[in-house]
Amino acid sequence: MQFDADALQQRGFDQVITTDQLCGSDLDVAVSALNQTQDVVFACEQQAQVFEQIQYELSQEDQLNASLSLIDLRDRAGWSAPDASHREITAKQAALLADAQLERPGTPAREVTSNGTCLIIAHDASVLPFAEQLGEELAVTCVLEQPPVTTAPSSNYDLATGKIRSIQGGLGAFDVIFDRFSTLTVSGRGATQFGPTQDGAESTCDIVIDLVNETSLLAAEATRDGYLRAPNPHPIELATLSARAKGLVGTFDKPLYVRYEGSICAHSRSQQTGCTRCIDTCGAKAIRSNGDGVYIDQDMCGGCGGCASVCPTSAILYDDPPFEFLVTRVKTLISTYRGAANSAPRILFVDRSFGKQLIANAARFSRGLPADVIPYEVDNVELIGHAELLAVLGAGASAALILKSPRTAKTAIANQSALTDRLLSGTTVDRQRVAVIEADSIEQLESALYGTALPDPKSFDVALLGGRREVTKQVIAAMTEHDGETPLHIALEPGDPYGTIEVDSDKCTLCLACVSQCPTGALNDRSDRPEINIVENACVQCGLCANTCPETAITLKPQFSLGKQTLDQQPLHGEDPFECIECGRPFGVKSTIEKIIEKLDGKHWMYTDSDNTRLVKMCDDCRVSAQYHDENAPMRGPDRPRVRTTDDYLDS
């Protein structure tokens, strides 16, 4: 493994120390480094727990505040690319070490308390010895589908029979509903007796052990802490379940992976459905409709981040890590590599389970990664959307790659990659610079990475500031060398989160229902005349305007546009107002008023041989006045008697 300490020290480290076995014979070097006040980076993760334990013990003794960062350079930039130049390897190592020094933002979390109340769901009494043993440490209730013929009550567990109907919640807060539920009569003699049955019996518990169901009772079982399932288990599985259940007692921190801001959510308005991208993307089924917005079940959420990558309004934000920090890491990796190697790297997004292990195996048993491929680890690659891919290219990488894992939802990655491809189609950048790699073996991974290097791209001066939509606009503008003024349009497909709308002027009555329903403020009207305007930069193609329009006059037009006009109000449809025949004040829509008059005048008994048609031509104030003084006004009384004067009496 090549490791140039002097070259790396020139890249910003105060001191670079090389060892052969940091976790073994050279462990004293690790202790010495951690026993100081300066921040430390260990370029080895194999014995991370050892180093973290040493740091913890030293901090307890001396109250040290030095931070410890760990990164495995061996798998990523050591045992790799045997034909790579010394300069390339050093550049890659410097980039990874610079990334390791970045201060990671903390993930918000909430406390989850489990007191050890455990529910066991089983077929028959064969599970009772397991319940007896587990009940020595947990508060156990065992619910059997088949009541036992004879069994003695136990002080270690409660026994009941029933069939589970539903289960909701997570660790420390499961809500369970049973049918045919019946509890053991503990005072009976002879055959086992149970009390009266009850449907819809409700209960709560902290831990659920399911020994019955072949399929999970809960959606997203893998993300539900506290739900342990093993249908028809053998003794070894029961022992494992027992150990896991006992470890689920106490207070835990549950990460809150996403934040939700309902005020800018484009899901629904007035019972009309608009954007459903997050609901469609969530493989854990943790998101559901909730009035005008959505509800995210944090107990079900596994933190994949797919919802945030497709949310067009940033109503859902991913916090592990935030998008802004992800971009900071991208810029750090690429700028450090380019500065040292004078060439552009490829960024490979991998997850911390499948992808990381595949890279480690490739490094240990084969050629490993090419010298220009820098792995970027995330918890789940589903959080990588079109904005992240474009940010990589905008920061100066030669390619943005995603390594799929078996647990990755295929549609989420495919849709975002396809959207990126469509956006790049309107630029001068080669669309092959973005790719999704499906590799189940070392050979497939290396086949996809070796021999496919692209020439260094043109360097773009992109700030990469703001959220996903802002970064996307900046990168595409740089790639098209847009002057900021000239209109430019890139055709997209239905469902893409950029575009405008078209209004059929023959159908539209300018009722402005669409304006009132637009969740992003992209649609607006004017105070002086009937008119619909759009700010295209704010349109997310949620479809609420089209679904709300009573005349079906609106059609979505997906496109990505650049230019000053996308930030300004652009008229879609407008007409002159009708002028009141009494006071001249403009009101309503001229064509609508004229159409009403055409359909009523002389064709309806209330508008035949009367002046009622004139009322339609009046503004609201003049109409009230005219009706009040009309001779046929329903509240009109008889004519007021003439006032009699003295002269009247004298004349009489």
Predicted regions: what is each one?
Residues 116, 128, 133, 137, ...:
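General detector of N-terminal leader/presequence modules that precede the first folded domain
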Residues 21-22, 264, 295-300, 378, ...:
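Conserved short loop/turn motifs at secondary-structure junctions
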Residues 290-330, 401, 408-411, 415-417, ...:
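Terminal amphipathic helices with adjacent charged low-complexity linkers/tails
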Residues 1-281, 285, 344-358, 409, ...:
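Ferredoxin-type iron-sulfur electron-transfer modules and their immediate structural context
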Residues 293-303, 503-508, 531-541, 569-570, ...:
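Flexible gly/pro/ser-rich segments immediately N-terminal to CXXCH heme-c attachment motifs
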Residues 241, 263, 306-403, 551-652:
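Flanking helices and flexible, charged tails adjoining ferredoxin-like Fe-S electron-transfer domains
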Residues 281-314, 513, 517-520, 529-548:
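Basic (Lys/Arg-enriched) interaction patch that binds polyanionic ligands
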Residues 110-132, 136, 289-291, 295-298, ...:
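Feature of Fe-S/electron-transfer and energy-metabolism proteins
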